[in-house]
């Protein structure tokens, strides 16, 4: 029986319960508390594998993209089950893969925002009303479904020191010059608890590659400015071929201050933003099975790293 629930909204409490259940069912899966969010929700890691290659996968930087969290959790569960049973995952021998790579994950970077969009926050309570007040100055953005930011109104994927000033200029020109549901870069790079902790964790792990999971568009973004990363395009092309997703350059208005941008700039290694599914966020859970099927080969290819 599956531990990861893919037919109900993935709240922060359900995510934490799932991580605990996975580490109990599969003792070779490990977890640690990375930090607490602005409103005190735990942000946890989930780690599987024992190999020398290190990769880091993140999901739910954006609140209304929470469907990416069960993608990561389901992958860890399927991988763990295959290790325990001496089987394979996606055609790869699980034991061999686990001995060659360690997969670090942060399945829910933005638990406060996710709980707003999934309905886990109660109207009348401070976190909900904080967001509701910020949203009133953006009447054209549906509330709470259009919410991407944390509950301080900062877009966590515009917080990284890789073209942050360019991102600020672009987003301010679009009217996102104050805290709100989306696209506000904050007062300074990495000034939010969530982004500071993830940047520190990334530096601590020093991974060979990162995947940042978002929705939507069935697209893989792979580059930052003119930074040349050996093998990045080739690996991206392989992931695109196996998933059916398109490998594309990031549109200019979204090309700065993202997590993968920062990783590419400072580490000089492959970093990818994966935009899963199609439609209007938050994507319905009816898309989950297709999203997971498309992304399993991406997750495995990134872990193996061979072109």
Protein language model regions, located:
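Short glycine- and acidic-rich boundary segments immediately preceding or forming the N-terminal edge
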Residues: 1-43
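Acidic/histidine-rich, surface-exposed loop or edge segments in extracytoplasmic proteins
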Residues: 1-6, 57, 180-181
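Surface-exposed patches in mature extracellular/periplasmic domains of secreted proteins
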Residues: 31-35, 85-94, 247-252
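Short beta-strand-to-loop junctions in surface cap/lid or active-site-entrance loops
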Residues: 44-52, 60
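Active-site/substrate-binding loop(s) of hydrolase catalytic cores
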Residues: 52, 67, 74-76, 80-221, ...
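Conserved beta-strand elements of the Class I
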Residues: 54-56, 272
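Di-metal (Zn2+ and/or Mg2+/Mn2+) metal-binding site signature of metallo-dependent hydrolases
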Residues: 63-69
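Metallocarboxypeptidase
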Residues: 163-307
């Amino acid at each position: 029986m599956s531990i990861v629930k893919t037919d109900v909204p993935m709240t922060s409490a359900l995510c934490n319960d799932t991580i605990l259940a996975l580490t109990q069912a599969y003792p070779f899966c490990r977890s640690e508390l990375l930090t607490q969010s602005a409103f005190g929700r735990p942000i946890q890691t989930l780690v599987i594998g024992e190999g020398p290659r290190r990769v880091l996968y993140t999901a739910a930087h954006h609140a209304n993209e929470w469907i990416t969290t069960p993608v990561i959790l389901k992958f860890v569960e399927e991988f763990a089950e295959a290790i325990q049973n001496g089987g394979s995952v996606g055609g790869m021998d699980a034991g061999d893969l686990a001995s060659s790579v360690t997969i670090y994950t942060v399945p829910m970077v933005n638990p406060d925002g996710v709980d707003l969009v999934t309905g886990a926050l109660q109207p009348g309570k401070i976190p909900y009303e904080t967001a509701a007040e910020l949203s009133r100055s953006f009447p054209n953005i549906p509330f709470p479904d259009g919410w991407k930011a944390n509950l301080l109104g900062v877009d966590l994927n515009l917080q990284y020191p890789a073209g942050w000033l360019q991102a600020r200029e672009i987003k301010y020109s679009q009217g996102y010059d104050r805290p709100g549901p989306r696209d506000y870069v904050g007062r300074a790079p990495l000034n939010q608890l969530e982004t500071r902790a993830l940047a520190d964790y990334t530096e601590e792990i020093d991974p060979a590659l990162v995947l940042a999971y978002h929705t939507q568009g069935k697209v893989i973004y792979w580059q930052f400015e003119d930074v040349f990363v050996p093998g990045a395009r080739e690996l991206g092309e392989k992931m695109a071929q196996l998933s059916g997703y398109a490998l594309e350059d990031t549109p200019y208005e979204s090309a700065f201050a993202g997590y993968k941008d920062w990783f590419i700039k400072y580490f000089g290694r492959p970093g990818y933003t994966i935009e899963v599914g199609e439609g209007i966020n938050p994507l319905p859970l009816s898309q989950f099975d297709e999203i997971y099927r498309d992304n399993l080969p991406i997750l495995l290819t990134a872990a193996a790293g061979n072109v």
